[in-house]
Each structure stands twice: as C-alpha cells, then as structure tokens.
Amino acid sequence: MNSKKRAYVSVYNKERIVEFCQYLVEYGYEIVATEGTCKVLTEAGIKAISAHELTGYPEPLGGKIRALHPAIYTGIIANELSEEQLSELGDKDIYPIELVVVNCYPFVEDMEAGVDFKEAASHIDSNGVALLNAAAKNYLHTVVVCDPDDYDRVLCDLAAGAI
C-alpha cells in the first residue's frame, strides 16, 4: 500500500488553489485532480496526477462525470483503520484519499444574477456533491475542504499535526 498521503482536488473557484496545493505537497501529499484543476496546478509547477491518468478512463460526457470512478470514490470512502478494507484496496491497487478539496459551480449565484436557467442548470455539479458526500460520510478519516476561506485553517492544522 502506498505510504504517501493523497489529496483529491476538483475546484471551480481556483482562487489560492496553487498556493494551497504547494503546501499540501510540502506536507507530503500526492495531488490527484480533475483535468482543469490539474492543468492549473501543473502549469504552476506543482506535480499533480490527473483523474484520467489515475483511473485510466477519460472524463465522459465532456467532463460531466469526472470523479465517479471506483479508484477515486472508493479511496475517499474507505476506512483506513479497517484491515479488511485496506486489503481490498490493495488488491484493487486503490489508495486511500485522506483530503478532499472540492468547491462546486456557483449555481445559486448564477440564478440570482439572472443567468438563463438552462445555462446555469447545465453546470450543476453532481461530481463535486458526490465527492463531498463521500468525504463527509468518512469524516473520521477524510478532511473535507469546500471553501477557499478554509485553506489557512487546514494548513495550520497540518502544521500543528492535528491532521
């Protein structure tokens, strides 16, 4: 089993994501990211693995189904204290994901700003919601970060060894 910690990053709001991920790398995290986020990170010199590269499966439907793959979803939801689950992950070459950084498309803000409903609805983020739900379900073993305003707090907790 891979001893490196893994973070999954999929953000619509890319504000401060480069700085945040740089610190995650310094704290020993391997970054896995959706295509757009991965591009931003790698262009900034941060080593990141695309979800496509991890799963060996391209993002179908123009990226509408990015993360709903067992190699990602199972890695998030697995209990790292369960030898049985860790063994199953190892058998399938899946690694735990300890930190999930996801923020979703701002559907409500678009609607409030008067964006056409069909246009706004086409951007509803089902992937991000599923990832956040999986991480929340595994709250004892997975850190969930869904707001860039929380980056500093998470980094402080990492520095203090609280995570």
Where are these regions (language model features)?
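Sparse, context-dependent recognition of short Cys/His-centered cofactor- or disulfide-binding micro-motifs
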Residues: 33, 61, 85, 127-129, ...
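General beta-strand structural signal in soluble alpha/beta enzymes
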Residues: 9, 30-35, 50-53, 78, ...
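Short, exposed beta-strand "edge-strand" segments with a Pro/Gly-rich flavor and a Y/T-containing core
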Residues: 31, 44-49, 62-68, 139-146, ...
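Short glycine- and Lys/Arg-enriched binding-loop motifs that mark or flank ligand-binding interfaces
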Residues: 32, 71, 124
